[in-house]
Amino acid sequence: MPVITVDLAVLPDRAVKQRLIESLTSAASQSTGIAEEKFIVLLNEMPRDNIGVGGKLLSDLVK
């Protein structure tokens, strides 16, 4: 079973997570020819205080 892992800042709600998982699964299935049912998608959410961009905390960059 193919696994898609995404590291990202905390998403605002369940609906956004669902759309992301559906989109990733669909794109991967179309690209590889592997059935959507075979894909596992893991979302690793991190607080914005734990992410740095250009030497700054993401929480300071996104308000």
Regions found by a protein language model. Give the residues of each.
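A domain-level signal for the structural core that forms small-molecule/cofactor-binding pockets
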Residues: M1-K63
